[in-house]
């Protein structure tokens, strides 16, 4: 009674899980040889739906049988399973247009021990494979092999995990190719590839043939099928799990696993529906442009709402930065602890990709918040906060201020990247150094307009941990003590440069004026010289006899000598004179003087030969009487 109940439950369980593990056990082979040969020809069932095989029900019932079961019980089990296989074959006899066939062409020939000394051909292996496209869609991950040994035991075995994984991979490629291609040429090419895979699986099964032969009772070979079924079941579970795709995406993000495959899939998905994507994108861009350009003026209530939204977005942006900095600090702590144990630089291969991935996540989040913030600022008309910096010179802006602002921005960027060493901390009165650094950085970043708005003050108060009044007071003092002197110094320096330039221009103009005046002065001097020369040449036609015979001349000389004047000089220019020549041509000086005797003396400006006793020889007028 117990045996019949067990047989019935086993047959029902086997009927429920038909299709993938189609086998007949090996109890009393002699009573079912003809039926077994027919079962070998119907191993592949065309169009049959392949359910997931669960080994718990069948194997547990198999383990309930004793190791040396009698012939009657074994024969009943064999007849029952053979009958079910024949019914299955008759039911699918009409659907014989399958493109797949058994992986083992010589499946009728096998070797199993029927007794200790005799070898005879026995059924060794059956392999079932889904054939129709509908079955591919429904059950793609069902594959397995069954080995039936003659003699004293029965062995249920699946292919190895590696072979099963390869089979699953090739089968998924084949199914995807068949689903995606409709032409007969592509289908034939993939079918050829699948035939190559069958040969590979055949070689693998033939190389591992001796591992599946069992001699003895059933219990001795039960551990291998259980291990194989559990491994292949784990693979099926992982492949069909709903967490597989998210896990693959995470691996792609962190370790760049399958990056190209995922990119191709995303591109194919985007290109599969180009009209919808393009239309939606175009419509969105046009609508956003229209709202940006034609946005009506905001009401006071809307403006207040956008102000609140702007403050919230700024706080969110600050929170993202704070979380990212906290993540970097925690990661650095882990890296330091790992380096202390494993050596310096040992954590770099493990943390680089993770840091890049997390930085990408934080950047995406920050960009999303920044886009919303920019939109709110544009609606409020705050172009500086929106990132639309005005081009050209504004009020109070000079090229020097612009250069200073650029240098300060570069210095701040270097500080953020860690390229510049941080200043050593030192105790300081007043506000905390960290808060002062944040406020000073904001001041130099907005050097052209160092007047924070209410939202900026609120954000700076959150960043520095100060109150809003402290932030306002600090900016008032900073504008008076720091910003204003710098601006005044810049303007003074520019004014000084302008004055120097003006002085240089004035000096150049003065030099030009002096040169012009010198040129003008040289021209009248030349005219006067010409005039004097002309007037001096008029009395040169006089002769010596005229001077001697003129009584008025002599009287004038005498009167001059008695008048008290000691001497006077008369210059005459004798040029082209033919009657009077004294020592050649040239200018001769005649000096009239008075001696102690009262006689008029005359001195000629002649060079003496050296033997003249007196240098200033005077002659009387009487001496010239005969001349």
UniProtKB/Swiss-Prot annotation:
Where does it localize?
Answer: Nucleus
Q: Write down the InterPro entries for this protein, in alphabetical order.
A: HD (IPR001356), Homeodomain-like_sf (IPR009057), KN_HD (IPR008422), POX_dom (IPR006563), TALE_homeobox (IPR050224)
Is the keyword Transferase in the record? Answer: no
| Highest taxon above the source species | Eukaryota
**Start and end residues of each stretch annotated as Disordered:** 206-225, 263-307, 494-530
Among the GO molecular function terms of this UniProt record, one is: DNA-binding transcription factor activity
Spans annotated as BELL domain: 302-373
Q: Which SUPFAM superfamilies match?
A: Homeodomain-like (SSF46689)
A cellular component term, taken from the record's GO annotations: nucleus
Q: Where, by residue number, does the polypeptide cross the bilayer?
A: none
What tissues express this gene product?
Answer: Expressed in lateral organs.
Q: Where is this region: SR/KY domain?
A: 241-257
What does the UniProt entry state concerning the protein's domains?
The SR/KY and BELL domains are responsive for the interaction between the TALE/BELL proteins and the TALE/KNOX proteins.
Q: Which PANTHER family match?
A: HOMEOBOX PROTEIN TRANSCRIPTION FACTORS
Family indicated by similarity: Belongs to the TALE/BELL homeobox family.
Assembly state and interactors?
May form heterodimeric complexes with TALE/KNOX proteins. Interacts with OFP1, OFP2 and OFP5. Interacts with KNATM, isoform KNATM-B.
Q: What is this protein called?
A: BEL1-like homeodomain protein 4
- Record the organism: Arabidopsis thaliana (Mouse-ear cress)
Give the gene that encodes this protein. Answer: BLH4
């Amino acid at each position: 009674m117990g045996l019949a109940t067990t047989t019935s439950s086993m047959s029902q369980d086997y009927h429920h899980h038909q299709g993938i593990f189609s086998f007949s056990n090996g109890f009393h082979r002699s009573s079912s040889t003809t039926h077994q040969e027919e079962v070998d020809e119907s191993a592949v069932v065309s169009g049959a739906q392949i359910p997931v095989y669960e080994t718990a029900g069948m194997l547990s019932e198999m383990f309930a049988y004793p190791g040396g079961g009698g012939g009657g019980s074994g024969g009943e089990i064999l007849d029952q399973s053979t009958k079910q296989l024949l019914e299955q074959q008759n039911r699918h006899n009409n659907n014989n247009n399958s493109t797949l066939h058994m992986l083992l062409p010589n499946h009728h020939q096998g070797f199993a021990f029927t007794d200790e000394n005799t070898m005879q051909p026995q059924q060794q292996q059956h392999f079932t494979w889904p054939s129709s496209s509908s079955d591919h869609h429904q059950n793609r991950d069902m594959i397995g092999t069954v080995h039936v040994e003659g003699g004293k035991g029965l062995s249920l075995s699946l292919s190895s995990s590696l072979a099963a994984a390869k089979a699953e991979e090739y089968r998924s490629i084949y199914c995807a190719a068949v689903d995606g291609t409709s032409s007969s040429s592509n289908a034939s090419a993939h079918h050829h590839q699948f035939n190559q895979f069958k040969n590979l699986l055949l070689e693998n099964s033939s190389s591992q043939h001796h591992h599946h032969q069992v001699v003895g009772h059933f219990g001795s070979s039960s551990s291998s099928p259980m291990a194989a079924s559990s491994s292949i079941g784990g693979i099926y579970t992982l492949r069909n799990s709903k967490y597989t795709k998210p896990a693959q995406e995470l691996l792609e993000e962190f370790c760049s696993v399958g990056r190209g495959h995922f990119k191709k899939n995303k591109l194919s998905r985007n290109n599969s529906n180009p009209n919808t994507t393009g239309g939606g994108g175009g419509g969105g861009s046009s609508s956003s442009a229209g709202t940006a350009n034609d946005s009506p003026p905001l009401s006071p209530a809307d403006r207040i709402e956008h102000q609140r939204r702007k403050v919230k977005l700024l706080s969110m942006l600050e929170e993202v930065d704070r979380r990212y900095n906290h993540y970097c600090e925690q990661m650095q702590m882990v890296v330091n602890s790992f380096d202390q144990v494993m050596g310096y630089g040992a954590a770099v291969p493990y943390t680089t990709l993770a840091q890049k991935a997390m930085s990408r996540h934080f950047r995406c989040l920050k960009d999303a918040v920044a886009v919303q913030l920019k939109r709110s600022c544009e609606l409020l008309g705050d172009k500086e906060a929106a990132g639309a910096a005005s081009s050209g010179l504004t009020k109070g802006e000079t090229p020097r201020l612009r250069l200073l602002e650029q240098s300060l921005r570069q210095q701040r960027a270097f500080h953020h990247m860690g390229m510049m060493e941080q200043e050593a901390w030192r105790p300081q009165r007043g506000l905390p150094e960290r808060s002062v650094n944040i406020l000073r950085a904001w001041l130099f970043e907005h050097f052209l307009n160092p007047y924070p708005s209410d939202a900026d003050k609120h954000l700076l108060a959150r960043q520095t941990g100060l109150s809003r009044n402290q932030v306002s007071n600090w900016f008032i003092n900073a504008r008076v003590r720091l910003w204003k002197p710098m601006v005044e110094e810049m303007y003074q320096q520019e004014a000084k440069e302008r004055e120097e330039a003006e002085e240089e221009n004035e000096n150049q103009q003065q030099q030009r004026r002096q040169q012009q005046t010198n040129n003008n002065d040289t021209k009248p001097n030349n005219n006067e010289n010409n005039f004097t020369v002309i007037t001096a040449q008029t009395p040169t036609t006089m002769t010596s006899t005229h001077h001697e015979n003129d009584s008025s001349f002599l009287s004038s000389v005498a009167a001059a000598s008695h008048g008290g004047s000691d001497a006077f000089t008369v210059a005459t220019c004798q040029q082209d004179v033919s009657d009077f020549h004294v020592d050649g041509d040239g200018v001769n000086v005649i000096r009239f003087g008075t001696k102690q005797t009262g006689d008029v003396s005359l001195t000629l400006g002649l060079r003496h030969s050296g033997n003249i006793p007196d240098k200033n020889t005077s002659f009387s007028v009487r001496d010239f009487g005969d001349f």
